[in-house]
Amino acid sequence: MLLYVCLVNLLLQSPSGVDSQVALGVIAKVGVNVAMKLISNIWKGDVVRGWKCAVENKSTKTLYALGTTPVSGHLATVLPDIPPQSTGMFVWSKSRGAARGAIGVVHYQYGNKVLNIMASIPYDWNLYGAWANARVTYQREPFSNLYYGRKGTKYPTRDGNWGKVDGTKFFLTEKSHAKFKVIFSG
């Protein structure tokens, strides 16, 4: 079995010379569990909430990075294109500031369709829980549809449970720095 891992580490510096962001693009011909181990040491500094995500592409087409829809926080790494039978990894983080969690949607182009992946990691675990969802549509799906189960979207899956929607299986852990595993079959 061919096993390859390509890691690209770029450390971006702000004009003042202080590290402002770490960008990491990863394409790996490994499963989601191995991919999670490869990026287990990403969070550093003042990240309060976040999720690291491994997307395993078991389909026959490349998943092309289409961008994000941030609600709170931002994509802290490079969003990679994911070839067939490979796994791409990225990190979403929320640093100090407003009392909000790490919340957003990542979009991948798949042929003429879009794979939308949503995670919501709360700031206050006493009031909220973590939720995840996915949907394959013909356009970028807004966060509100994925979070509230609107406009034909299945209601999201609570952390600690496997969700399955549109040929996509996913699992989100219940932690402030959550692990989000996505297995896309197409």
Curated annotation (Swiss-Prot):
Domain of life: Eukaryota
Cellular compartments annotated: Nematocyst; Secreted; Target cell membrane
SUPFAM superfamilies for the chain: Cytolysin/lectin
Stretch forming the signal peptide: 1-20
Any one GO cellular component localisation term in the record: nematocyst
Gene3D superfamilies: Cytolysin/lectin
Motif mapping: Cell attachment site: 158-160
GO biological process annotation, one example: pore complex assembly
Keyword list, A-Z: Cytolysis, Hemolysis, Membrane, Nematocyst, Secreted, Signal, Target cell membrane, Target membrane, Toxin, Transmembrane
GO terms of molecular function: channel activity; toxin activity
InterPro entries attached to this UniProt entry: Actinoporin_PFT, Anemon_actinoporin-like, Cytolysin/lectin
Principal cellular location given in the protein's record: other
Purpose of the protein: Pore-forming protein that forms hydrophilic pores and causes cytolysis. Compared to equinatoxin-2 (AC P61914), it reveals lower cytolysis activity (5-12-fold difference, tested on erythrocytes), a larger pore size (probably 2-3 nm) and different affinity to membrane lipids (100-fold lower affinity to sphingomyelin). Binds to sulfatides (SFT) as well as to the two sphingolipids, lysophosphatidic acid (LPA) and sphingosine-1-phosphate (S1P). It seems to bind more strongly to LPA than to S1P and SFT.
Family of this protein: Belongs to the actinoporin family. HALT subfamily.
Domain notes: Composed of a long N-terminal alpha-helix and a core region rich in beta-sheet structures. Before the pore formation, the alpha-helix binds the lipid membrane, partitions into the lipid-water interface and stabilizes the monomeric molecule on the membrane. Finally, it traverses the bilayer, thus forming the transmembrane pore.
Subunit text: Octamer or nonamer in membranes. Monomer in the soluble state. In vitro, interacts with folate receptor alpha (of target organism).
UniProt-recorded name of the protein: Hydra actinoporin-like toxin 5
Gene source species: Hydra vulgaris (Hydra)
